[in-house]
From Swiss-Prot:
The modification Phosphotyrosine is found at residue 42. The modification N6-lactoyllysine is found at residues 10, 15, 19, 24, 28, 57, 80. It comes from Bos taurus (Bovine). This is Histone H3.3C. The modification N6,N6,N6-trimethyllysine is found at residues 5, 10, 28, 37, 57, 80. The modification Citrulline is found at residues 3, 27. The modification N6-methyllysine is found at residues 5, 10, 19, 24, 28, 37-38, 57, 65, 80. Residues 1-44 are annotated as: Disordered. The modification N6-acetyllysine is found at residues 5, 10, 15, 19, 24, 28, 37, 57, 80, 116. The gene is H3-5. The nucleosome is a histone octamer containing two molecules each of H2A, H2B, H3 and H4 assembled in one H3-H4 heterotetramer and two H2A-H2B heterodimers. The octamer wraps approximately 147 bp of DNA.
């Protein structure tokens, strides 16, 4: 049979789809999520620093009012039963308590930094209180 010249023809759809090999299917352990992108995660510490800056700018109370009120009433019951509190008194106690705690944590953070750490530990709180003269 003699050779004939091949002429260029237009494609009519290409090849038929082949069946996927079993080994290739077994390699995919988890099914694809249909193009779902995994959620963005900030690096450790980024969100904490953002929260610190946000709280330093604001003046609102950080402890919820009702849990603090329950705590005050529970502590007051040890001294005298059936005590009544004005809402302004509870508010003043909460303001003073939060101011004390914020100051204590600032000093505690300085103690941790002095020890060349960034993590606050109970011993930092104890040192800060001892330096302040609160606990001998």
């Amino acid at each position: 049979m003699a050779r004939t010249k091949q002429t260029a023809r237009k494609s009519t759809g290409g090849k038929a789809p082949r069946k996927q090999l079993v080994t290739k299917a077994a390699r995919k352990s988890a099914p694809s999520t249909g193009g779902m992108k995994k959620p963005h995660r900030y690096r450790p510490g980024t969100v904490a620093l953002r929260e610190i800056r946000r709280h330093q700018k604001s003046t609102e109370l950080l402890i919820r009012k009702l849990p603090f009120q329950r705590l005050v009433r529970e502590i007051a019951q040890d001294f005298k039963t059936d005590l009544r509190f004005q809402s302004a008194a509870i508010g003043a106690l909460q303001e003073a308590s939060e101011a004390y705690l914020v100051g204590l944590f600032e000093d505690t953070n300085l103690c941790a930094i002095h020890a060349k750490r960034v993590t606050v530990m109970p011993r930092d709180i104890q040192l800060a209180r001892r330096i302040r003269g609160e606990r001998a």
